[in-house]
Amino acid sequence: MNGEEIIRFERVTKEYDGTVVLDDVSFAMERGKFYTLLGPSGCGKTTILRLIAGFIEPTEGTIYFHGKPIQNVPPNKRQVNTVFQDYALFPHLDVFENVAFGLRVKKMKEADIRQKVSEALRFVNLEGYERRRIQEMSGGQRQRVAIARAIVNEPEVLLLDEPLSALDLKLRTEMQYELRELQRRLGITFIFVTHDQEEALAMSDYIFVLNKGKIQQFGTPKDIYDEPINRFVADFIGESNILSGRMIDDFLVEFAGKQFACVDRGFAPNEPVDVVIRPEDLELAAPEDGQIVIRVDSLLFRGVHYEICGYDENGNEWLVHSTKKAEVGETVGLRFEPEAIHVMRVEREDEGA
């Protein structure tokens, strides 16, 4: 970690009625970065958010804020604010009073409240909406109000619990850019929870991929997409062709009944492995020129590319994204570079990362 540490979990476990929802998790976060907690429902991502906010306490382990344990610090004393999935706005208050609510609780002077609310609304592009009623706001505008209400208190960390999930696709995409730009302008730490892989890849400095209460992988969006650590991450982050194989030697792997040059090393000879090739890294070719030959089973036009699904002679399914079209029933070749092959160690079902 190169920057200033703001949050650290040391061997944190959370149980509910004997059920482990977060299992011996350790990590650290830097000030001023955009982090995403990504995973399927029930993986533990919202539990981490609630632990940071102080809404729940860990069963085991320690949580640090600026190097000091915070277990006994109540939520209202932590330099943390949360934007909830449903925004949790007050329908009987206008935009100004929703944003000012926390400042009034702190008994701040009226002049200071006006100044801070105006600054917060300017940050989220809602100047002039001060007296608008919440019922008159669109979904995207309500989300901006919720964010303004959170940042007006000048938190060091902003927690966002799936705040885009209720928006339509176009608005969700717009808000991704707005949130990322807001984080850069504010310079505070954002911790964003989502199950949407594209959101995580588009917005984050760093991503935690979680499954079954454990962190499977941590890294930049590019690291996690290009170098998934196991089959779960490869399958969860984008579309993938995942095949069972074995490592013959350094830079030589066998899968789909053939041996291929690759860029991976450090495996035992003949070690069982999982092999990942992304659909966009496959190129259509004539059957005689293909490293793999498939029979096309289905074809979908996705606008920017065709999505082609087929099977090789060993029954392995292949997914291809190509600007070239192939007909259902046609036999085609697939070509790929050694750099497109990613070799992963096989993990047992009960293993974490």
Curated annotation (Swiss-Prot):
Tell me the residue numbers annotated for binding ATP: G39, P40, S41, G42, C43, G44, K45, T46
GO CC, any one term: ATP-binding cassette (ABC) transporter complex
Cellular localisation? Cell membrane
Membrane topology term reads: Peripheral membrane protein
Domain ABC transporter spans what residues?
Answer: 7-237
Q: Which keywords are on file for this protein?
A: ATP-binding, Cell membrane, Membrane, Nucleotide-binding, Translocase, Transport
SUPFAM superfamilies associated with the record: MOP-like, P-loop containing nucleoside triphosphate hydrolases
Main location per the UniProt record: membrane
Could you tell me the superkingdom of the organism this chain comes from? Answer: Bacteria
List the PROSITE patterns.
ABC_TRANSPORTER_1 (PS00211), ABC_TRANSPORTER_2 (PS50893), POTA (PS51305)
Recorded GO molecular functions are:
ABC-type putrescine transporter activity; ATP binding; ATP hydrolysis activity
The record's listing under Pfam families reads: ABC_tran, TOBE_2
* InterPro entries linked: AAA+_ATPase, ABC_SmlMolc_Importer, ABC_transporter-like_ATP-bd, ABC_transporter-like_CS, Mo/tungstate-bd_C_term_dom, P-loop_NTPase, PotA-like, PotA_ATP-bd
Task: Please explain the role this protein plays, according to its UniProt record.
Answer: Part of the ABC transporter complex PotABCD involved in spermidine/putrescine import. Responsible for energy coupling to the transport system.
Question: What family name appears in the similarity comment?
Answer: Belongs to the ABC transporter superfamily. Spermidine/putrescine importer (TC 3.A.1.11.1) family.
Q: How does it assemble?
A: The complex is composed of two ATP-binding proteins (PotA), two transmembrane proteins (PotB and PotC) and a solute-binding protein (PotD).
Protein's name according to its UniProt entry: Spermidine/putrescine import ATP-binding protein PotA
Q: Name the lineage.
A: Bacteria, Bacillati, Bacillota, Bacilli, Bacillales
